Amino acid sequence: TRAMLAEKRGDLPGLEQDLRNIIEREPDNAAALNALGYTLADRTTRYAEAKALIEKAYQLDPEDPATLDSLGWVNYRLGNLAEAERYLRQALEKYPDHEVAAHLGEVLWAQGKQREARKVWAGALEAQPDSTILRGTLLRLTGSEKL
């Protein structure tokens, strides 16, 4: 879709507009609500708006691991670390993905749980050793791409 192409090009305004157009036509499209909410949480400081979109997606599909990850990430951005950890653990349990593991590890790290964060990252790196997301998170937080 155009929204995905806009994301690949780094066109945040285009991505946002395309997702808003989808939501306008399909107000209960949980995937579009979550995609827009996550994008805002990850790439802007519009956290309240992001959280409202993600929470609507969650109400529509509370079992979706991508939405659980987004809820965790937006709560992290808002400083709600315990809440962020809870959602990210649920997401990782349902979908053991390298990006979710990077997010959970970062939240654990921010809470001073470095040993636990490293354990989460190690498990994810074992499954996906070429993950640039995990390596980038490690480098940013620990100063090294290696555990």
Predicted regions and their residues:
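Register position in tetratricopeptide repeats
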Residues: 1, 8, 42-43, 77, ...
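Residue-level recognition of tetratricopeptide repeat
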Residues: 4, 29, 38-39, 64, 73, 97-98, 106, 131, ...
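Structural marker of alpha-solenoid helical repeat scaffolds
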Residues: 25-26, 60, 93-95, 127
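TPR alpha-solenoid repeat register
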Residues: 32, 67, 100-101, 134
